[in-house]
Amino acid sequence: AFTELERVLVRGCGLARPGWLDAAEAAWADVRAGGPVRHAVVPVWRRPWMVLGRDTFAGDVLARLGVRHLYSGHPERYPRIPIQELTARGADLVVLPDEPYRFTADDGPEAFPGLPAALVSGRHLTWYGPSLAEAPAALTAALSAAR
């Protein structure tokens, strides 16, 4: 992602290399997924339930943090999956971003009884740009706090 960002910003747009790109590269260079791999369902919408599927930036970010999302092999990037299938999939974690759908402690976790829920910043999970410098720390903290 960093090479592509530099290509677009510096070579494509003729801008100076932004300082946040250096900070983001440094932040992610130190990331090493430690401990056991978590297996997660990652909804991005409700009514209907939609989750991360194949080839997504957010899926790659989570993988770097030791979280494998269970629909990474789905033919669609954001498949619609019935809640009954999501809860039966065998996840040990549900990751609930606050965008594009705004999942909260009161809206989302209740659909996954008995499953720890990590409420994460959608900006840190899905946005290219300056937030990438803060993303490893912010997402790791949210994943560690999953209840």
Model segments located where?
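N-terminal ligand-binding lobe of clamshell/alpha-beta domains
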Residues: 1-147
